[in-house]
Each structure stands twice: as C-alpha cells, then as structure tokens.
C-alpha cells in the first residue's frame, strides 16, 4: 500500500512540474525587446555637388598671379604653361577658368573619379581652384598635331578617309544618319568653347585625350 501511495505522489509531482513549465511564458529574445536603430538618411551626392558649386561661385574671381604658384604641382603632368607633352594628360593652357575650377571641384568630391587628381584636389579651397584656373586661362595653347592616317577599319563608313578630315566633318556638321550632333553647337567653330564652367575649349587639345574622354 505504501509503495502504491509513494508512486502516486511521485507521479503527481511530475505532472505538476510539467504543467507549471507549460504555463510559464517563453522568455522573449533580448533582441526583440530592443527597438531597431533608425537607418541613417542616405546622402545625396548631387546635393553635395550643388553646395560645392555654390561655394565656388562665391569665391573671388581667379587671380592668375596667385595661381602661378599654386599651379606648380600641376607642371609634372600638364607642363609649366599648361601645354602637356604627353597626350595622356590634357592641355590646360587657354582653358576657361570656370571649367578648370569646376572640374577640380568634381575631382575633390569624387564625382569625377580619378585617383591621381583626387590627391591633388583634396586640399584645394574654392579660391585655390579659381586662381589655378585663372593662371592656365592666361597661358597660350600650342597647336595640336593632326592625324592624317587613313582609316583602315573595314566596318567604318569612313574607310579610306583621313582621320583629320573625318574629324573635321563630324565636328562641324555631325552625322545625321548616325545621330551624331555637330560639336560646334557648344564648342564653337574654332573650338574655343564658351567662357564658363560648361563648354571647354577643345582647340589644340591632344587628339588621344579627347578621344579617351569621349
């Protein structure tokens, strides 16, 4: 009898323990109790560019004399007077101040990716950029060298014509059949562009550099 009673008590204790365990609510994960941190607002790169352009416009007009010293670091690639000898690097002589200063701004912001130019532009202030632009704008650009090589590409519609001749046709009149607009509309008949930040001078520029940018 005692054995049966002991077994009954033991069985009841097990049932009570299981019932209590089932009744206890599951512990909520700690992560669920903590609210997720709000996501950082996305940065608008165009807003940064616009702000930088506004700051550039507020700087004083470029001082060519002050820019001469500041442009010394540019000489290794672009030449002392802005007439680079290597077609890998553009000629800056005679280029518009507004165009040069705006491009330096884009390099500094990384909006125009170029690791080399980023290193040079990173420490420049808007006034530095305008001064450098003014210096190169006062320099005389050297004439470029025309490529008179005939086009050999069998698939080219200009096969057999000289590169310089085809280039002049496209620059002055475009090619309506291929939806190519004339370059003169923005850069002018002589390639001098429009003073300001948007339409650079192309006259005398290295053909290789121009082709790479296009």
Residue ranges and their predicted role:
Residues 49-114, 211:
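The feature marks the first
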Residues 5-13:
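Sec-dependent N-terminal signal peptides
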Residues 14-19:
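N-terminal signal peptide c-region/cleavage motif recognized by signal peptidases
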Residues 85-91, 107-152, 195-201:
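Axial heme c-ligation environment in periplasmic c-type cytochrome domains
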Residues 20-30:
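Cleaved targeting-peptide boundary
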């Amino acid at each position: 009898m005692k054995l049966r009673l002991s077994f009954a008590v033991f069985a009841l204790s097990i049932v009570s323990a299981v019932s209590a365990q089932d009744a206890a609510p599951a512990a909520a994960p700690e992560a669920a109790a903590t609210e997720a941190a709000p996501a950082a607002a996305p940065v608008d790169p165009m807003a940064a560019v616009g702000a930088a352009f506004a700051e550039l416009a507020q700087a004083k007009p470029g001082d060519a004399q002050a820019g001469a010293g500041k442009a010394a670091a540019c000489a290794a690639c672009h030449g002392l007077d802005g007439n680079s000898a290597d077609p890998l690097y553009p000629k800056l002589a005679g280029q518009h101040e507004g165009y040069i200063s705006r491009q330096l701004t884009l390099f500094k912001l990384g909006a125009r990716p170029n690791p080399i130019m980023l290193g040079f532009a990173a420490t420049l202030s808007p006034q530095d950029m305008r001064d450098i632009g003014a210096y190169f704008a006062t320099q005389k650009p050297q004439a470029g060298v025309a490529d008179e090589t005939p086009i050999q590409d069998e698939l080219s519609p200009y096969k057999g014509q000289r590169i310089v001749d085809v280039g002049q046709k496209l620059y002055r009149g475009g090619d309506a059949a291929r939806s190519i607009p004339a370059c003169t509309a923005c850069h002018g008949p002589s390639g001098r562009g429009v003073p300001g930040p948007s339409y650079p001078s192309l006259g005398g520029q290295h053909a290789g550099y121009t082709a790479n940018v296009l």
